[in-house]
A protein has these predicted regions:
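A short, charged, amphipathic alpha-helix used as a generic interaction element across diverse proteins
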Residues: 42-44, 51-69
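A broad, low-specificity signal for short, low-complexity segments enriched in glycine/proline
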Residues: 7-11, 36-37, 67-70
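A general marker of short, structured functional hotspots
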Residues: 3, 13-14, 23, 46, ...
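Intrinsically disordered, low-complexity and often Lys/Arg-enriched segments
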Residues: 1-2, 73-75
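Negatively charged, low-complexity tracts enriched in Asp/Glu with abundant Ser/Thr
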Residues: 1-14, 40-41, 51-53
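Short aromatic-glycine-(Arg/Gly/Cys) micro-motifs in beta-strand/loop hairpins
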Residues: 20-46, 61-62, 73
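Beta-strand residues that line the small-molecule/cofactor-binding core
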Residues: 17
Length: 75
């Protein structure tokens, strides 16, 4: 399992997070799981499945780069 956790402080009261995780699933596929939301709140999540690690890693990097461009910083 590979994980990247990012945070963004938009105001003093709102601490946002964005998490990207790469893991193998039970069907020998590689999953990219993304979660985002308010810290301490209920997160939203999306899971994408890929046939190989290279494609999953590229997708995870795209999502992480997009989050960093939007102001999220590594934890």
């Amino acid at each position: 399992m590979i994980e990247c956790l990012l945070y963004r402080n938009s105001t003093a009261q709102r601490r946002l997070f964005y998490r990207v995780e790469i893991a193998m699933n039970l069907f020998s596929e590689v999953s990219v799981m993304r979660e985002w939301g308010l810290a301490g709140g209920r997160p939203k999540a999306v899971v994408q499945c890929f046939s190989n690690l290279r494609d999953a890693s590229r997708a995870a990097d795209r999502h992480r780069n997009r989050a960093e461009r939007r102001g999220y910083l590594r934890a």
